[in-house]
Amino acid sequence: MIQEFQIRVLPEQAANEQSLKQFIGHDKGLDIRTIHALRILKRSIDARQRTIYVNLKVRLYINEMPQDEEFTRTIYNKVDGKPQVIVVGAGPGGLFAALRLIELGLRPVVVERGKNVRDRKIDIARISREHKVAPESNYSFGEGGAGAYSDGKLYTRSKKRGNVNKILNVFCQHGASTSILADAHPHIGTDKLPRVIENMRNTIIECGGEVYFETRMDSLIIEKNKITGIETNTGKTFKGPVILATGHSARDVYRWLYDNGIEMETKGIAVGVRLEHPSMLIDQIQYHNKNGRGKYLPAAEYSFVTQVEGRGVYSFCMCPGGFVVPAASGPHQIVVNGMSPSNRGSKSVSYTHLRAHETPEHL
C-alpha cells in the first residue's frame, strides 16, 4: 500500500530517515516496522518564526518496496537516417531542443562555437588566473552554455513555464541528484553539471545525432526566402531546418539577423550590480540564530522586490554559499556572475540587485 502525507518537522528530523519514520508513525498511528520505504516528494523550509520547520510531502510504501525509479525516464529511440534539424548552440536551450527532436523522431545536428564542457574549463580557469578571455571559450560560449560554470540553478520567472517537471526528470536521467525533484529551489551545482551535460551529449550521439564543437555559425543559408541551413567558420555547411539556441552573448548572430532583415523582438532589460554578503550574516538573519544555520539547515537565501520611482527593483540569481566570478565573453569587457557548488559551502552569499528598464527602441 502507498500513502502520501504532508508533514512539518524539525530540521534534524528531516535529515534522518529513521527519525522521519518515527515521527510519521507516531503522528499517523502507523507501525514503523510496516514502512518499508519512504520518498520525499516536496521539501521547503519555513523560517518565518523563531523555530525553523521543514515542510515535507512524503510517500510511504507500507509492506512493499518501490517498483519504480525516483524519476520518470524519457525514451530516446534511434534516429539514424531520419530528417535532420540543425541546432545552433549547445547551451541548455540547444541540448534540450536536441533531446526533444529525438523524441519526435528527428535527427539533431548540434553546432557549438565553443569547446566541449571539459576542455572549456581550462579556458575559464585562465580568466581568473591570467586575466585572459578566449573569445569562443569562456563563461558564455561552450558546451553547457552560460549556466554550466555559473551555478546550475533551476529556476524561472517566466509565466510560460512549460513542463518543468519533465525538465527536472531529464536532468535526473542524465545524472543529477533526485533531490531537485523535491526541493522548492532546485540546484545542481557548478561542480556537478559538467557530468550531466556530457551525459546529455552522449544520449544525442548514441541515438544517431551529431555534435560539432569549435564550429561557429557565420550565416544562415536562405533560398527562395526560406532558411535551408547554415554556413560555418570551418567551411562546412549543414542543410536542414534551423533552431537558433545561441544565448544572449552571441551578438554577431543578432547583427547578422538584423542586417539580413529577419524580424526580431526586443526584451526588457534590467541593470544593476552583483554583491556578496558573509554567509554567516544571512544565516543569522534568516534563521534567527546568532550561531547561524547549524548542522541540518542549508545556506540561507532571501529575495526581495519593491517599486522605486515606478520601476521594479528586485534581487535575482541568489547564490547561497556562493561567490562572484568573472564572466566576460570577450576582450574589453568587465562582466561578473555568481555561482555556487552543489554543497553551497562557501563563506559568502552572492546575488544580483537589479532595476528594470525599458529597452530603447533604437536597440
Model feature map: region roles:
Residues 2-83:
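Extreme N-terminal leader/targeting segments of oxidoreductases
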Residues 244-291:
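Glycine-rich loop(s) and the adjacent beta-strand/alpha-helix scaffold that form part
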Residues 85-110:
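N-terminal Rossmann-like FAD-binding beta1-loop-alpha1 element of flavoenzymes
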Residues 233-241:
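Core beta-strand elements of the Rossmann-like FAD/NAD(P) dinucleotide-binding domain
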Residues 6, 119, 125-210, 215-216, ...:
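Conserved N-terminal/central alpha/beta ligand/cofactor-binding core
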Residues 213-226:
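A conserved short coil-to-beta-strand element within the FAD-binding core of flavoproteins
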Residues 352-361:
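Conserved small/polar residues in nucleotide/adenosyl-binding loops
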Residues 106-124:
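Glycine-rich FAD pyrophosphate-binding loop
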